[in-house]
Amino acid sequence: MAMTLPITAVTAAICALLLLITAIDTVRQRMQSRTAFGDGNGNARLISASRSHGNLAEHAPLAIIMIALLEPSADPRALSAVAAVFVFARICHIFGLYAPMSTEPPLGRKIGVVGTWLTYVVLIAWTLYAVARLGS
């Protein structure tokens, strides 16, 4: 049996795994700090854990949806590359949120933000272009 959207499936599975890992760490940090809600009065580890989870949950769905919409007609190598950059950016962002903070954001966080935004721009433009081509 052939899978209809393999690039989307792999991207979604990796993002789901990252969400599970960050959710488990958030619960672990909550248990260690005995914090049911909130950030534990500024507990840096809890904030990092909950934001790494929340930020991924905020960004992954739309990227996955656009990848799924593009996949049936897209060049699989190009779409795989964009999906890989997105996943790499999200992993960098997670590591960046766990890095010790100084006066500026850690490199991983910067790479994660820029990589996520760039893949969003590419996916948005590609999706709109694909829709525009339907009308011609």
Regions found by a protein language model. Give the residues of each.
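Juxtamembrane boundary at the C-terminal end of a transmembrane helix
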Residues: I124-S136
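Short alpha-helical packing/oligomerization segments
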Residues: I67-A89
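Physicochemical signature of membrane-embedded alpha-helices that form the seven-helix bundle of GPCRs
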Residues: T11, S50-H53, V82-V85, G108, ...
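Interfacial loop-to-transmembrane junctions
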Residues: I94-V121
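Alpha-helical transmembrane segments
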Residues: L5-I21, R77-V82
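Cytosolic, membrane-interface loops and tails of multi-pass inner-membrane proteins
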Residues: I24-S50
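Core segments of transmembrane alpha-helices
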Residues: G54-I67, Y120-V121
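Transmembrane alpha-helical segments that form the membrane-embedded catalytic/substrate-channel core
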Residues: I14-Q32, V87-L97
